[in-house]
C-alpha cells in the first residue's frame, strides 16, 4: 500500500495506485498513525473554533474493567454526529470523561483484595482502600483509551474530566448547595432499597436496573382476633410473599371501604378422603376473615359465609395475636384515632387506602421496618419500628429459630414452624420479579434507616415540562418509558454509606442533629475552619477529619458519600470546575444545555434521568435537548453476552479481524439505533462485503482506468459554483484556471445520459443523507448509502465500462466527483476507509484542498442538478433490464448470446429516449427494442378448475364444473374473468343447470408461445425473441472467445492496458465466427496481432468451446 502521507506538490497530479483488495485492519493502523502525525483531530477543532457551538456531552464510562462490545456501540454514535456537525462547520468540543467513584470501583477493588464486605474495608483502612480505588481507575482508563483510538472515536482525552478530581468534587458540592438552599435536600428516616453486601441504600433509578425473576413462597397465615365482636372465634387471614418479615409484624392493614366477610369451613362428610387444614383445631376457630371480593378466589369450595360482614373502617383497632414473640416490642406513646386511644403498643388493625382486592386476601401484613407504605401507615398510629435485621442482611443472633441467617434463607424454617403450629393456612411457590443489587447481584432488602434525600417529587411538574421540550429518539420513550418514570418519580436517596465517592458537604452540630451546614467549596469550608483548605484532597478520610466550632458548638461532617449518579448527572457544569475554576463560567454558559447525548436505553433510569434532574434542580432547565437511546448488544444467537455462556466478543479482536469501519457500520446501519443488535463475525463480514468492499472496488476501478488513460482531475474537483459545470460548492483558491493545468470538466448538460443520471442521484443522496443525520437516523443513512453504492457499482460502472476503457472525460469526471461526494458522506460513519480513499484520490490530485476528508466541508445538494424525470426513466430502464434478465434465465439463454429483439409495452417504450433504449439493448444483448400492444399476444393461456374453491360451492358436482372449465376456450375464459369477474357456464348437474365461476374458481396459467420468453411483473412485460440465426450464433461465439481470452489475460497477470499478440486454434465453425468478428475481438482483448496457428501443448484450452489460445504480452 502506498504512503498514507504523500508529498503534496503541484506536480502530484495522478491518483495513487489503489489495489483491488484491501486489508481493512492493517489500513486502520496506518490511518491512526496518519492522524497522529498530522494532528488531524486538533486541526478539525481549530478549523471550527469560530463556528456555531453544537454541544455534545460524553456520558462518562466507569473505568473499572476491560471495555466490551457494548462500549463500542455508544461510542460509534457519539462519534458519528460530532464528525458530521464538524464537517458542517459547527464547533463541537468533544471532552472525554471518566466516572471514577462509586460501588463499581469499590467492588472491583474488594475483589482484588479478597474482601467480603465493609468490615474488611474498615479493618484495612479507608485511606489505603480509597488509594487502591484511585489506582484502579487510572489503571483501567488505559484500556478504554486504547479502544477509543482503535475505533477512531475522536474525543479530547488530554483534557478529560475526572469525577474524582478536586475541582469536579467541589462543583458537585456547589450544585448540592443550590439544591440545599432551595430546601430540596434533607435527611429522613425512610424505607429504601438497601444492599446488605455493599452496606448502602440505592436510589430508585439504581433499583430499576437490577430486577431478576425469583421463586419465593407466597403464604396465607391466620392471626387470631383478640378484641372486637369476633374476638376468640375468628382469625384474620393475611397474605404475604415475605415470610421473614412476620417476625417483625406490627399491624394488619385493611381498606376502609372494602367489605370483609366471615367464612366457615364446611364439615367434612364421614368417609370422605378430604383432609382439612389444621383439622386438629376446633371447627369454630376455623372462621376466617377475608375481603368479600376475594372469598371465592382464595377459599371457594368447602367454605361457606356465616352472614357476618364488616367494613374495613369498622375493624379499625381490633387487636390480634401476632405470629411470633421473638422480639421485645418497645413501649410507645399511645395516640388517639378518631377520639379513641390505640388499644395496645402494637398488633391491631389499621386502615390504608393502598390495600387492594386484586391479590391476596385484602388484609395486608405490616412490618414498618421493611416497607415504605407500612412505615407511613404505622407512623400514623404511633406504632413502633422493630428491625431484627443487621446491616449485613442477617437476623440478630438473639432471634430464635433464624438467628444469624440471611433474611432470604430464613423463609424456609419460618414457614415450617408456622405450619407446625397451625398458623400457616396455605403455602404456594411463585415466580416474581425481585430487586437485586445492580452491581453485586445480592438480594436487596427494603430497610428503614436515616438517609439524605433530594426531594425530586417537589419538582415533578418542572421535570415533566422539561421532558416535553426534549426530543427523544425513539419518540415513544418521551411519554413511555421515560415519561412514566417521571410520573412515578419518588425522592432521590442520594446518600451512600460507603467510602470512595464525593463526600456529602454537610457538617452537623454535635449537640443538635437538626443543625446542619452545607458548604459549596473548600474555600467556604476554609472560612469555617479558619485555615486554608483549598489544596486538600476532599475525599474520605481526609475530609472526615475536618471539624470546626461555631457559637461554641463543634461540627463534624456526616459520614455518607454521594450517589455516583449525582457525579455523572452534574457533568455539564462540573466538567469545567464551574463556578470555582477561572474561565469555567464562560465555558459552561456556552455549552449549556447540550444539543446531543447518547447512551443505551437503560440509561432512561440512570444518566438520562439524573442529567435532567440535576439540571432542573440547579438551573431550572434540563441539561440536554436531544437524546438518542441505543438498543442492547446481543450474541449472534440472540442471547445476552456473558462469561457464563462463553459468548462474549471483545471489541479489539473483532476490529483486528474485520476492521474498525466494519464494526462501526454494523453498529450504525444494521437496524434502528434503539433496536437490539446481534453481533457476530458473520454479520460483520456481511457488512464488509455488501458496502465497504463494493465502495473500495469502485474506487479501484476509477483509479485503474484513470491511470491507464493517463487521466487526472483538475486542481479542484468542485470547480465552479455554476451548476452547469458540476455539483456546485467550493471555488478553488487557485487563480487563473478552473482546473489543474487549465483542464475544465465537461458541463453536466453535455455529458452522457448515465453521467447526468449519476450527478442527479448523487445530489439526491446528499439531500437525503443530510436530512437523515439531522434526524439522528443512521439506519436510513446506511440504507441510502448501501443502495447508492450498489447502483453505482452494478449499474453505472458496469454500463459505463466501455467509456472508461476509452478514456471518456465525462465518465472519468463524473465518477471522480461522485466518489469525492460519497467519501465525504460516508466519512462520519466509516472514517478509516474514507480517509484512505481521500489520501489516494483527492490529496494527491488537489494539493490546495483539505489534507483529510475530516477537514473537508460537508457537501450541499444542488437542486438544479436533480433531474426527477431522468431518475424515473432510468428506474424504468433498470426494471426492464431486470425483467429481461429474468426472461433470459427462464429460457436458459446466456447473456453473451445476442438475440434479435426484445419487446416491451408501447407505453413503456414511449417513456425511454434513444440513449436509454441503447442502454437496455446493450445490457440485454439484443439487436433491437420494439413495442407490442398487449402481453396476451405473446402467451398462450391454460385454464383448469381450482378444486378447493369449487368443492366448497358445488360439492359432488365439482368434477363436472371442473370439466366445463377445462373444455372452455382458455383465451376467452381468461379475458371474460379479467373483464367481468365471473362467467356463467352450462353444467346440468348443478342446481338450475348453470355454474357461476369466478376468478377464485379458476387457475389460469400463461405459457409463452414457442420461440419466446416472456416475463411480466407489476404491469410491465418483457418478451425475448429466442430464435438464433447463424449470424447471431457466430456473434455469441465471438463473445465467448473474448471472455476466454480475457480470463487468460488475468491468469497471465497482465495489466488492463497491456497489449498482446494472440495465437488461436479452433474448430471450423468457431474459426468462422472468430474470423468474422476478428476486429471486435482484437479491440476487446487489446490484441495488436491475431493469428491462427497449430495448437501447442502450453496453450490455454477451453474444451467446451473447442478453442485454444496463447496470449503473449507485447
From Swiss-Prot:
The keyword Transport does not apply. It is found in: Cytoplasm. A motif ('HIGH' region) lies at residues 61-71. Keywords: Aminoacyl-tRNA synthetase, ATP-binding, Cytoplasm, Ligase, Metal-binding, Nucleotide-binding, Protein biosynthesis, Zinc. It comes from the Bacteria. The keyword Ribonucleoprotein does not apply. ATP binds at residue 643. A motif ('KMSKS' region) lies at residues 640-644. GO terms for molecular function: aminoacyl-tRNA deacylase activity; ATP binding; isoleucine-tRNA ligase activity; tRNA binding; zinc ion binding. Its EC number is 6.1.1.5. Its cofactor is Zn(2+). One of its GO terms (cellular component) is cytoplasm. It is an enzyme of class 6 (ligase). GO terms for biological process: isoleucyl-tRNA aminoacylation. It catalyses: tRNA(Ile) + L-isoleucine + ATP = L-isoleucyl-tRNA(Ile) + AMP + diphosphate. IleRS has two distinct active sites: one for aminoacylation and one for editing. The misactivated valine is translocated from the active site to the editing site, which sterically excludes the correctly activated isoleucine. The single editing site contains two valyl binding pockets, one specific for each substrate (Val-AMP or Val-tRNA(Ile)). Monomer. Belongs to the class-I aminoacyl-tRNA synthetase family. IleS type 2 subfamily. Catalyzes the attachment of isoleucine to tRNA(Ile). As IleRS can inadvertently accommodate and process structurally similar amino acids such as valine, to avoid such errors it has two additional distinct tRNA(Ile)-dependent editing activities. One activity is designated as 'pretransfer' editing and involves the hydrolysis of activated Val-AMP. The other activity is designated 'posttransfer' editing and involves deacylation of mischarged Val-tRNA(Ile). This is Isoleucine--tRNA ligase. It comes from Cutibacterium acnes (strain DSM 16379 / KPA171202) (Propionibacterium acnes).
Amino acid at each position: 500500500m502506498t504512503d498514507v502521507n504523500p508529498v503534496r506538490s503541484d506536480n502530484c497530479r495522478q491518483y495513487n495506485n489503489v489495489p483491488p483488495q484491501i486489508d481493512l485492519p492493517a489500513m486502520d493502523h496506518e490511518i491512526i498513525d496518519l492522524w497522529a502525525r498530522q494532528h488531524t483531530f486538533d486541526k478539525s477543532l481549530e478549523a471550527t473554533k469560530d463556528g456555531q457551538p453544537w454541544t455534545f456531552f460524553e456520558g462518562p464510562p466507569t473505568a473499572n474493567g476491560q471495555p466490551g462490545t457494548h462500549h463500542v456501540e455508544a461510542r460509534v454514535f457519539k462519534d458519528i454526529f460530532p464528525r458530521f456537525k464538524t464537517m458542517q462547520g459547527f464547533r463541537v468540543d468533544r471532552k472525554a470523561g471518566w466516572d471514577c467513584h462509586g460501588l463499581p470501583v469499590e467492588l472491583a477493588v474488594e475483589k482484588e483484595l479478597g474482601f467480603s464486605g465493609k468490615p474488611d474495608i474498615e479493618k484495612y483502612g479507608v485511606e489505603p482502600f480509597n488509594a487502591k480505588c484511585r489506582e484502579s481507575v487510572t489503571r483501567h482508563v488505559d484500556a478504554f483509551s486504547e479502544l477509543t483510538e482503535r475505533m477512531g472515536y475522536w474525543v479530547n482525552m488530554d483534557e478529560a474530566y475526572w469525577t474524582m478530581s478536586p475541582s469536579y468534587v467541589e462543583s458537585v458540592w456547589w450544585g448540592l448547595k443550590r439544591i440545599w438552599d432551595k430546601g430540596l435536600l434533607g435527611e429522613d428516616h425512610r424505607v429504601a432499597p438497601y444492599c446488605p453486601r455493599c452496606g448502602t441504600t440505592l436510589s430508585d433509578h439504581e433499583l430499576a436496573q437490577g430486577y431478576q425473576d425469583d421463586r419465593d413462597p407466597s403464604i396465607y397465615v391466620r392471626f387470631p382476633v383478640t378484641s372486637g365482636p369476633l374476638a376468640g372465634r375468628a382469625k384474620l387471614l393475611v397474605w404475604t410473599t415475605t415470610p421473614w418479615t412476620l417476625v417483625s409484624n406490627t399491624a394488619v392493614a385493611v381498606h376502609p371501604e372494602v367489605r370483609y366477610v366471615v367464612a366457615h369451613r364446611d364439615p367434612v362428610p364421614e368417609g370422605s378422603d378430604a383432609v382439612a387444614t389444621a383439622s386438629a383445631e376446633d371447627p369454630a376457630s376455623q372462621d376466617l376473615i377475608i375481603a368479600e371480593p376475594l372469598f371465592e378466589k382464595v377459599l371457594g369450595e368447602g367454605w361457606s359465609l356465616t352472614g357476618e360482614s364488616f367494613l374495613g373502617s369498622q375493624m379499625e383497632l381490633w387487636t390480634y395475636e401476632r405470629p411470633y414473640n421473638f422480639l421485645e416490642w418497645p413501649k410507645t406513646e399511645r395516640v388517639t384515632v378518631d377520639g379513641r386511644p390505640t388499644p395496645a403498643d402494637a398488633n391491631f388493625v389499621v386502615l390504608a387506602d393502598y390495600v387492594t382486592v386484586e391479590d391476596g386476601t385484602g388484609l395486608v401484613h405490616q412490618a414498618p421496618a421493611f416497607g415504605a407504605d407500612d412505615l407511613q401507615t404505622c407512623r400514623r398510629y404511633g406504632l413502633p419500628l422493630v428491625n431484627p435485621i443487621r446491616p449485613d442482611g442477617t437476623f440478630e443472633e438473639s432471634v430464635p429459630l433464624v438467628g444469624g441467617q440471611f433474611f432470604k434463607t430464613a423463609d424456609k424454617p419460618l414457614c415450617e414452624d408456622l405450619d407446625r403450629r397451625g398458623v400457616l393456612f396455605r403455602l404456594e411457590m411463585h415466580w416474581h420479579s425481585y430487586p437485586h443489587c445492580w452491581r453485586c447481584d445480592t438480594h436487596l432488602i427494603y430497610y428503614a434507616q436515616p438517609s439524605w434525600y433530594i426531594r425530586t417529587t417537589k419538582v415533578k411538574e418542572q421535570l415533566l415540562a422539561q421532558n416535553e421540550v426534549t426530543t427523544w429518539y425513539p419518540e415513544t420513550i418521551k411519554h413511555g418509558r421515560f415519561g412514566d418514570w417521571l410520573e412515578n418519580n419518588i425522592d432521590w436517596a442520594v446518600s451512600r454509606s460507603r467510602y470512595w465517592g464525593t463526600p456529602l458537604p454537610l457538617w452537623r452540630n454535635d449537640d443538635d442533629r437538626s443543625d446542619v451546614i452545607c458548604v459549596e467549596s473548600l474555600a467556604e469550608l476554609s472560612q469555617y475552619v479558619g485555615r486554608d483548605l483549598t489544596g486538600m484532597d476532599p475525599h474520605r478520610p481526609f475530609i472526615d477529619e475536618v471539624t470546626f466550632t461555631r457559637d461554641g458548638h463543634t461540627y463534624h461532617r456526616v459520614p455518607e458519600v454521594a450517589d455516583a449518579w449525582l457525579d455523572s448527572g452534574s457533568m455539564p457544569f462540573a466538567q469545567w470546575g464551574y463556578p470555582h475554576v477561572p474561565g469555567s463560567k464562560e465555558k459552561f454558559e456556552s455549552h449549556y444545555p447540550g444539543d446531543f447525548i447518547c447512551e443505551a436505553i437503560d440509561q432512561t433510569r440512570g444518566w438520562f434521568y439524573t442529567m435532567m434532574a440535576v439540571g432542573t434542580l440547579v438551573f431550572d432547565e434540563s441539561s440536554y435537548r436531544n437524546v438518542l437511546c441505543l438498543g442492547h448488544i446481543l450474541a449472534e444467537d440472540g442471547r445476552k453476552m456473558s462469561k457464563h455462556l462463553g459468548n462474549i466478543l471483545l471489541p479489539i479482536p473483532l476490529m483486528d479481524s474485520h476492521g474498525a469501519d466494519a464494526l462501526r457500520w454494523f453498529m450504525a446501519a444494521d437496524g434502528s439505533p434503539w433496536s437490539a443488535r446481534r453481533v457476530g463475525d458473520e454479520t460483520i463480514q456481511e457488512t464488509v462485503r455488501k458496502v465497504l468492499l463494493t465502495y473500495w472496488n469502485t474506487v479501484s476501478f476509477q483509479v485503474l482506468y484513470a491511470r491507464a488513460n493517463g487521466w487526472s482531475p483538475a486542481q479542484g474537483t468542485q470547480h465552479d459554483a455554476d451548476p452547469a459545470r458540476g455539483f456546485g460548492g467550493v471555488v478553488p483558491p487557485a487563480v487563473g484556471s478552473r482546473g489543474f493545468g487549465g483542464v475544465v470538466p465537461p458541463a453536466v448538460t453535455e455529458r452522457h445520459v448515465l453521467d447526468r443520471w449519476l450527478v442527479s442521484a448523487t445530489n439526491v443522496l446528499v439531500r437525503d443523507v443530510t436530512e437523515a443525520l439531522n434526524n439522528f437516523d443512521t439506519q436510513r443513512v446506511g440504507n441510502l448509502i448501501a443502495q447508492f453504492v450498489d447502483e453505482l457499482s452494478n449499474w453505472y460502472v458496469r454500463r459505463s465500462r466501455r467509456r472508461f476503457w476509452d478514456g471518456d472525460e465525462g465518465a472519468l469526471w463524473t465518477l471522480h466527483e461522485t466518489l469525492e461526494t460519497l467519501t465525504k458522506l460516508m466519512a462520519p460513519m466509516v472514517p478509516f476507509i474514507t480517509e484512505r480513499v481521500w489520501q489516494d484520490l483527492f490529496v494527491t490530485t488537489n494539493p490546495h484542498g483539505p489534507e483529510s476528508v475530516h477537514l473537508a466541508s460537508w457537501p450541499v445538494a444542488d437542486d438544479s442538478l436533480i433531474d426527477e424525470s431522468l431518475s424515473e426513466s432510468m428506474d424504468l430502464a433498470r426494471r426492464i433490464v431486470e425483467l429481461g434478465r429474468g426472461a433470459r434465465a427462464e429460457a436458459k439463454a446466456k447473456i453473451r448470446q445476442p438475440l434479435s429483439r426484445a419487446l416491451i409495452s408501447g407505453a413503456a417504450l414511449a417513456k425511454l429516449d434513444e440513449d436509454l433504449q441503447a442502454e437496455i439493448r446493450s445490457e440485454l444483448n439484443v439487436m433491437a427494442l420494439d413495442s407490442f400492444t398487449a402481453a396476451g399476444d405473446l402467451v398462450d393461456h391454460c385454464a383448469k378448475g381450482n378444486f378447493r374453491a369449487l368443492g366448497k360451492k358445488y360439492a359432488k358436482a365439482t368434477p363436472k364444473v371442473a370439466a366445463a372449465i377445462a373444455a372452455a376456450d382458455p383465451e376467452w375464459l381468461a379475458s371474460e374473468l379479467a373483464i367481468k369477474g365471473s362467467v356463467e357456464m352450462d353444467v346440468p348437474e348443478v342446481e338450475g343447470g348453470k355454474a357461476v365461476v369466478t376468478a377464485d374458481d379458476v387457475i389460469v396459467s400463461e405459457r409463452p408461445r414457442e420461440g419466446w420468453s416472456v416475463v411480466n411483473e407489476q404491469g410491465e412485460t418483457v418478451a425475448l425473441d429466442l430464435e438464433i440465426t447463424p449470424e447471431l450464433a457466430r456473434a455469441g461465439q465471438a463473445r465467448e472467445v473474448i471472455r476466454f481470452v480475457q480470463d487468460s489475460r488475468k491468469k497471465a497477470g497482465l495489466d488492463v492496458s497491456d497489449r498482446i499478440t494472440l495465437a488461436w486454434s479452433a474448430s471450423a465453425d468457431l474459426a468462422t465466427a472468430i474470423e468474422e468478428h476478428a476486429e471486435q475481438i482484437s479491440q476487446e482483448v487489446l490484441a495488436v496481432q491475431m493469428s491462427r496457428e497449430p495448437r501447442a501443448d502450453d496453450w490455454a484450452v477451453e474444451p467446451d468451446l473447442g478453442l485454444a489460445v496463447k496470449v503473449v504480452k507485447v
